[in-house]
C-alpha cells in the first residue's frame, strides 16, 4: 500500500470511533483521561473538550506534548484494530473555536449546553494495528 492508501485506512477508522485515551505528562507525573473526540481530517487533528482545571488539562497547559490510544473492545484477536498516536495540543480560541465547537456539538449534541474549552490535538505520528489486514499488520503515518 502507498501512503495515500495507508492514510485512507487510518482516516476511516478514526472517523468511526469517538473516544480516545489521552496521556499527559509533566516532570515525573503522568496521567491518562478518556475524551470524546471529532477527527478533523483536513488538519489531521482531534477536537476534544476538557476543562482547564482537570488534572490532564493542567498538565497540557504545562506540557502540550501528548500521546494516546484509540481502541475498540473486540473479542476476537483477528478483528483487533487500534491506534497509537502522539502530537501537540492547543486550546482553541476565536473563529477556530467556533468552527470546532459547531462540529463537535453536531456529533455530541449533549455538549451544546456546556462552555467547556475545546482543544485541538495536532497529530504528529500515528501507528495503527489492523489484524483484519493480516495478524499484527501495522500502518504508520508521520507529519
Curated annotation (Swiss-Prot):
Superkingdom field: Bacteria
InterPro entries: Split_barrel_FMN-bd, UPF0306
Alphabetical list of HAMAP family matching this protein: UPF0306 (MF_00764)
Record family assignment: Belongs to the UPF0306 family.
Protein name: UPF0306 protein plu4501
Amino acid at each position: 500500500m502507498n501512503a495515500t492508501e495507508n492514510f485512507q485506512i487510518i482516516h476511516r477508522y478514526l472517523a468511526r470511533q469517538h473516544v480516545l485515551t489521552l496521556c499527559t505528562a509533566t516532570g515525573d507525573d503522568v496521567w491518562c483521561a478518556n475524551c470524546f473526540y471529532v477527527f478533523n481530517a483536513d488538519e489531521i487533528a482531534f477536537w476534544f473538550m476538557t476543562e482547564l482545571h482537570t488534572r490532564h488539562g493542567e498538565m497540557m497547559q504545562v506540557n502540550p506534548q501528548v500521546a494516546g490510544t484509540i481502541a475498540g473492545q473486540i473479542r476476537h484477536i483477528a478483528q483487533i484494530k487500534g491506534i497509537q498516536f502522539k502530537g501537540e495540543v492547543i486550546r482553541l480560541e476565536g473563529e477556530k473555536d467556533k468552527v470546532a465547537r459547531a462540529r463537535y456539538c453536531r456529533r455530541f449534541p449533549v455538549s451544546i449546553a456546556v462552555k467547556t474549552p475545546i482543544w485541538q490535538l495536532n497529530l504528529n505520528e500515528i501507528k495503527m494495528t489492523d489484524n483484519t489486514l493480516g495478524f499484527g499488520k501495522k500502518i504508520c503515518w508521520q507529519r
